[in-house]
């Protein structure tokens, strides 16, 4: 979320003071109506690596799916402008059953994707609409390019009650700092189907602005959805990454400092 301009409260974007003390990358790169994706994440990471040279780089945040995609390798994607992307998004949105449609145009690709994996189904359909080629055929012609740099993976393990309390406090802080006003200004300015409007904290605020939630219900919805997301992220990290170091905040901090002193580029 921090990649988007003007979403500061909802993304808990680092303050100017924090950015002054520690160099941050990939902040404020996209307008609200532009699309974020794994290839862009990879490009921004590579740009940061070029600039940082011998400095230690930390990739932080909840984008574990993007990170996994980069480590396993990405195929080059069709080059599309924003208007083309929005047109494809709308075409996919008209499908009654996206998975059934994918199965009809590319049974081989559909076989590799679970029917509930909406993200991968969506990406496959994007390729089809952009190239008019079955995704499996497209990937044969555009094989994955693996990430060629050493990387060490860390994940925080926080006791459930402590984590839930932090989520509740963070939600309260966002609301106190003007979350609703921030989203209201953006929602009146940009297309309603913009990608950031689907994010937790943002989508609930929109429901509040549309008078579908009370203020109390808004806060409860953000807390509940964030807790569910944290659980999914934890499961994903533990099941999808090998050699993952899991520990408390202090343990992870100590491990990162130890590895940074050894000169490993992370």
UniProtKB/Swiss-Prot annotation:
Catalytic activity: adenosine(37) in tRNA + dimethylallyl diphosphate = N(6)-dimethylallyladenosine(37) in tRNA + diphosphate
An example Gene Ontology biological process: tRNA modification
InterPro entries the record matches: Dimethylallyltransferase, IPT, P-loop_NTPase
Site positions per UniProt: Interaction with substrate tRNA: 63
Obligatory cofactor(s): Mg(2+)
Keywords annotated in UniProt: ATP-binding, Magnesium, Nucleotide-binding, Transferase, tRNA processing
Keyword Nucleotide-binding applies: yes
MF annotations from Gene Ontology: ATP binding; tRNA dimethylallyltransferase activity
EC assignment: 2.5.1.75
Role this protein plays: Catalyzes the transfer of a dimethylallyl group onto the adenine at position 37 in tRNAs that read codons beginning with uridine, leading to the formation of N6-(dimethylallyl)adenosine (i(6)A).
Family the entry assigns: Belongs to the IPP transferase family.
Protein name: tRNA dimethylallyltransferase
